[in-house]
Amino acid sequence: MYYGHEPHDWGTSSSTSDMKECTICEAPSNGYHFNAASCSACAAFFRRTVTLNRNFVCTHQNTCRVNYAMRVICRACRYHKCINMGMERSAVQPRRDCNAGRRKIMYNSTNSLKTQEHTFAPPTPTVPQTTTVIVTKDERIYEDSSPEIHYAQSYSSSISEEISSLSPKISVSMCSGTDITLNFEAEQVLEDLLREERLFNERRKLLYCSNSCISELLTNENANEIPYSQSNLQPLTFAGIQKHIRPQILVIYEWLRGWRHFELLNIKDKSVFLRRCVLYHTILDPSYLSYRLGLPEKFVMFNGMYVGVQDGDKTGWEDEKDCITADLKIKLYRPLMDRLINEVCVSMKVINLTFVEFVLLKALVCFKSSTTCEVSVPLKKFMNTYMDTILRALNVHYQTLGMTKEDIAQRIGNVILMMSSIFAVGMECLESHQKIQFFDLWQLDDLLIKLIQRGGGGANY
């Protein structure tokens, strides 16, 4: 567990070690999967393709570009590149036969009707010998989606109450085939979240790295982990924060739109979800950047600006004429920064939080915080099911790393334990900024005020 009180070494950690490049999609990778240097996303794609025995046909003469930053990747070209780069179908474990899934559950005729009212019997999984899918660049098909996902795609202006039947579907796994299907869905969720985080980082890099040359902006080095390098960091000015708040809200909104069910939500649910994402991105992104780049000397904000952490270091805490005084800066934000460092950044360092863990932690926090607010009941149920899938994705990720069940349980527990501290800091952040707005202590962005003045106080964590 991470709640010890021993001194913390903020030197280079394993999470910052050199990363090899995935030979398929060019994303950073630190290992081999199926005998080829690849990232976990390409490994998951190859495993699904082989296990389900799928064939893809490219409509563009197999010349499509395959890159991790693309929203839609041609699956035919991606599979061919996996083979060309050395991945072996024989290295994938064959799909286990699921006899239990084919057995019918027998009930007494007198009780069958009552049983059917309360018991969900999962359909027998049927897998054709070969499935051919025509793939174009302009379409995005989730062939491995579960019944929950198919239902969500038919979600209109409000979710039907039928979604209440989704919750039991995860818990009634009756055969290994069902487990395999759920694992495929979890891998797809992980792939989606990793892709959106990479795009999120690339957008921030283009928006905020004003001193970088074009070649530096376009490089893919470490792009899926942190958007900045030490040379990009600049002393913080509150005027700069004012200028960059709205672009940051925009890139958070784009991250949110990457969730494939977001456009199916009604306006009220979208609004609540956006508020929670803005709040917790504002907490988690600086914490992770500081853990990776800044501490123990610097606390790095979302835009690459930093303030001094050590006593006596006035960097970023100076007076700013016509904006905010040094005393007000320290009074309003120094306690919040200290709490973030001690309760979030230190925890990240102690457990040596990896990029994949950070991505899934951020998704869990955003979804969980939304379910504690006034979202519709059907959406709340669906989000709870989706969080189960995120946790399953984390478990599958650990399994691909060869971790034991005991290590996996401890690791997941450490990640989940971080959430309570993050929620507590979130509530303090809301209260602090509501006071700033109420007493007009300094000028906040109007859109930010609208996002934090509602939906923040009624959450119970």
UniProtKB/Swiss-Prot annotation:
Gene Ontology molecular function terms on file: DNA-binding transcription factor activity; RNA polymerase II cis-regulatory region sequence-specific DNA binding; steroid hormone binding; zinc ion binding
Is Thylakoid found in the keyword set?
Answer: no
- GO terms for CC? nucleus
Principal place of residence:
nucleus
Entry's localization field: Nucleus
Q: Which UniProt keywords apply?
A: DNA-binding, Metal-binding, Nucleus, Receptor, Transcription, Transcription regulation, Zinc, Zinc-finger
In terms of InterPro entries, this protein maps to:
HNF4-like_DBD, NHR-like_dom_sf, Nucl_hrmn_rcpt_lig-bd, Znf_hrmn_rcpt, Znf_NHR/GATA
Q: Could you tell me which residues form the DNA-binding region?
A: 19-94
Give all residue intervals belonging to the NR LBD domain.
185-455
Q: Where are the zinc fingers (NR C4-type)?
A: 22-42, 58-77
The Swiss-Prot or TrEMBL record describes its family as follows:
Belongs to the nuclear hormone receptor family.
Query: What role does this protein play?
Result: Orphan nuclear receptor.
Which protein is depicted?
Nuclear hormone receptor family member nhr-121
Q: Which organism is it from?
A: Caenorhabditis elegans
